[in-house]
């Protein structure tokens, strides 16, 4: 079944709602590639007028303890404690993120840096197009993201970090966003907003974009894979309020995980499958929360006052990257990328720009 071409005014409204809300079995048409000159390769990264930020800045914050919240899971499994990593465990790998280098909500770009904040690169250089929701492939060789393509549609793209080639993986009408590659690198999961229904759908596809199809009976957004690749963690308002759920790839075993106020969506599963991290709270008062994978033993991870959001575990599971405003609270362009250990210590700022850096996703 081929989707109908949407009414453009309606699609513009959907895109606006989507961006400001989430600042976030049909066969798929045959995939196609973009022309290489539409986007940058790694050899043409950050323009000379954009200086690399100062990196790895420790943030002075008062000592704090985890805030415990009543668990939501009815499971009788024992609560586990988050281990305290040694001070010698330093962050490694790379972090991809959305960088608002032009201070404009109409031209967001995708950037990449090492996990200590060094080697900053801007990956996209189509200055007048919007790019969102990057993620790094499990093998560390490519970055996926959502970008404007044509007719007010957003599609999923994959940028090869080795040779700089760029592929368009989806070809649909509507909004395809928040893409992630499965742990075995065989499949994609992403959010699809269909203009005909205005529903947020979870979509599975082959890594190259083929065999496109919805997870049956599931409406939601911001999907992320379980470490074993057998389930998806996502956000949904199916019961009236936004909460996190897990579901099998065939739509079975739908399980509500959280019962937190004002959850937005972006979350992550620890590499060992033991923990989930998410964020919750009203605007300008959001915090990160870490919990057991069944939703029990919920604790506040970040110190209060930073409006923290959009968490992502490091590949070794010892750190979490996120967006916050600790140093520029209340400023429109004040969001930066921070990391923190999973025991809530060693908070560090990685970026220090006069524009917003957000939606971090950690990879090898």
Describe each region flagged by the PLM.
Residues 1-2, 117:
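Accessible peptide chain termini
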Residues 14-19:
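Sec-dependent N-terminal signal peptides
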Residues 26-364:
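Sequence signature of WD/YWTD-type beta-propeller architectures
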Residues 2-13:
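Bacterial N-terminal signal peptides that target proteins for export
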């Amino acid at each position: 079944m081929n989707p109908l071409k949407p009414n453009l005014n309606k699609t513009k409204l959907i895109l606006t709602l989507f961006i400001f809300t989430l600042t976030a079995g049909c066969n798929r048409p045959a995939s196609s590639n973009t022309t290489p000159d539409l986007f940058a390769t790694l050899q043409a990264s950050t323009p000379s007028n954009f200086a690399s930020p100062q990196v790895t800045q420790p943030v002075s914050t008062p000592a704090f303890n985890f805030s415990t919240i009543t668990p939501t899971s009815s499971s009788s499994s024992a609560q586990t404690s988050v281990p305290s990593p040694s001070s010698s465990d330093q962050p490694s790998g790379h972090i991809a993120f959305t960088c608002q280098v032009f201070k404009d909500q109409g031209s967001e770009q995708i950037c990449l840096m090492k996990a200590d904040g060094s080697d900053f690169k801007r990956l996209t250089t189509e200055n007048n197009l919007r790019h969102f929701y990057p993620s790094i492939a499990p093998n560390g060789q490519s970055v996926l993201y959502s970008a404007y393509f044509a007719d007010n549609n957003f599609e999923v793209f994959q940028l090869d970090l080795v040779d700089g080639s760029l592929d368009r993986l989806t070809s649909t009408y509507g909004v395809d966003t928040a893409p992630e590659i499965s742990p075995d690198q065989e499949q994609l999961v992403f959010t699809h907003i269909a203009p005909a229904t205005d529903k947020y759908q979870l979509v599975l596809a082959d890594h190259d974009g083929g065999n496109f199809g919805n997870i049956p009976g599931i409406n939601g957004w911001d999907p992320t894979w379980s470490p074993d690749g057998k389930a998806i963690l996502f956000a949904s308002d199916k019961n009236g309020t936004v909460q996190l759920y897990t579901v099998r790839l065939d739509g079975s075993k739908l399980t509500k995980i959280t019962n937190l106020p004002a959850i937005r969506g972006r979350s992550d599963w620890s590499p060992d499958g033991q923990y989930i991290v998410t964020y919750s709270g009203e605007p300008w008062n959001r915090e990160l929360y870490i919990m057991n994978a069944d939703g029990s033993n919920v604790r506040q991870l970040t110190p209060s006052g930073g409006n923290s959001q959009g968490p992502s575990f490091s590949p070794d599971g010892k750190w979490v990257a996120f967006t916050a405003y600790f140093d520029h609270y209340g400023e429109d362009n004040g969001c930066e990328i921070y990391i923190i250990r999973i025991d809530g210590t060693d908070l560090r700022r990685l970026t220090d720009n006069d524009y917003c850096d957000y939606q971090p996703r950690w990879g090898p």
